[in-house]
């Protein structure tokens, strides 16, 4: 499932427990990510799913759920 993959990538990138990550988690407010973390996270997701996320789409991604929804529309 996409959520598990995304959660593991986020946990690894941010150095946090995967159990802390929910669909509603905000990268900045809940998970403590800064703008550099988000750029690195987008790059890791692009590599994992073999896709390219345009900057205008990346700017709209604020929560874990946003990532999962975005990837679901592209990958499946």
From Swiss-Prot:
Pfam families: PP-binding. Keywords: Cytoplasm, Fatty acid biosynthesis, Fatty acid metabolism, Lipid biosynthesis, Lipid metabolism, Phosphopantetheine, Phosphoprotein. Pathway: Lipid metabolism; fatty acid biosynthesis. The modification O-(pantetheine 4'-phosphoryl)serine is found at residue 35. GO terms for biological process: lipid A biosynthetic process. GO terms for cellular component: cytosol; membrane. It comes from the Bacteria. 4'-phosphopantetheine is transferred from CoA to a specific serine of apo-ACP by AcpS. This modification is essential for activity because fatty acids are bound in thioester linkage to the sulfhydryl of the prosthetic group. Signal peptide: none annotated. PROSITE patterns: CARRIER (PS50075), PHOSPHOPANTETHEINE (PS00012). GO terms for molecular function: acyl binding; acyl carrier activity; phosphopantetheine binding. It is found in: Cytoplasm. Residues 1-75 form the Carrier domain. Its main location: cytoplasm. Belongs to the acyl carrier protein (ACP) family. Carrier of the growing fatty acid chain in fatty acid biosynthesis. This is Acyl carrier protein.
């Amino acid at each position: 499932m996409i959520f598990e993959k995304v959660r593991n990538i986020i946990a690894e990138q941010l150095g946090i427990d995967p159990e802390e990550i929910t669909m509603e988690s905000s990268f900045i407010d809940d998970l403590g990510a800064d703008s550099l973390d988000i750029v690195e996270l987008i790059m890791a997701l692009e590599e994992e799913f073999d896709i390219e996320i345009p900057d205008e789409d990346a700017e709209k991604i604020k929560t874990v759920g946003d990532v999962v929804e975005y990837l679901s529309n592209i990958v499946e």
